[in-house]
Regions:
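Glycine-rich adenosine-cofactor-binding loop
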Residues: 28-46
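Single conserved hydrophobic/aromatic residue that forms the stacking wall/gate
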Residues: 146, 153-157
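Conserved SAM/SAH-binding loop
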Residues: 103-109
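Short amphipathic alpha-helix with an adjacent loop that forms part of the alpha/beta core around
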Residues: 109-117
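Conserved S-adenosyl-L-methionine
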Residues: 48-52
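E1/E1-like adenylate-forming module used to activate ubiquitin-like modifiers
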Residues: 120-149
């Protein structure tokens, strides 16, 4: 672990214990959809010391995103959301490996998209309900940690 990493995230050991903090540091989490929910989820994970993130989204930052998406600013207008988020994370957590996939997730293509990541956990923040239900069913069957912050409880398994 680098000295910078230790100074930035070492305090988590006092909060979660050595083993608990190490589980957070070693986690590989994929966030599907880097918009109003997903950008904040990715931010929280990176600021919590997670050292490997996967970000999946096809959209680009627009002015209408600025009021609710943490990576959206005048400087990032027109950038892909995944690149804007990766750039933001690199500014405060350079030890975080951020893998990006510039794809739209739907009910048919998500298994192939997630297969390349092999995550420990998936946060579903995509907009498409059919994709959400398909991913939730798969996660339950695979015993994979999965959450979908949504108004309907499709969520945790």
């Amino acid at each position: 672990m680098s000295a910078d990493f230790e100074r930035r995230f070492g305090g988590l050991r006092r909060l979660f214990g050595v083993a608990g903090a190490q589980r957070i540091f070693d986690a590989h989490v994929v966030v599907v959809g880097i918009g109003g929910v997903g950008s904040w989820a990715a931010e929280a994970l990176a600021r919590s010391g997670v050292r490997r993130l996967g970000l999946i989204d096809l959209d680009h930052v627009s002015e209408s995103n600025i009021n609710r998406q943490i990576h959206a600013s005048t400087a990032t207008l027109g950038m892909s959301k995944i690149d804007a988020m990766r750039q933001r994370i690199a500014g405060y957590h350079p030890d975080c490996q951020v893998d990006v996939l510039d794809e739209f997730v739907d009910a048919e293509n998500w298994p192939a998209l997630l297969q390349g990541f092999r995550p420990d956990a998936v946060i579903d923040a995509c907009d498409q309900i059919r994709a959400k239900t398909a991913m939730a069913a798969w996660a339950r069957q695979s015993c994979l940690l999965y959450t979908s912050p949504s108004p309907r409880d499709l969520s945790t398994s």
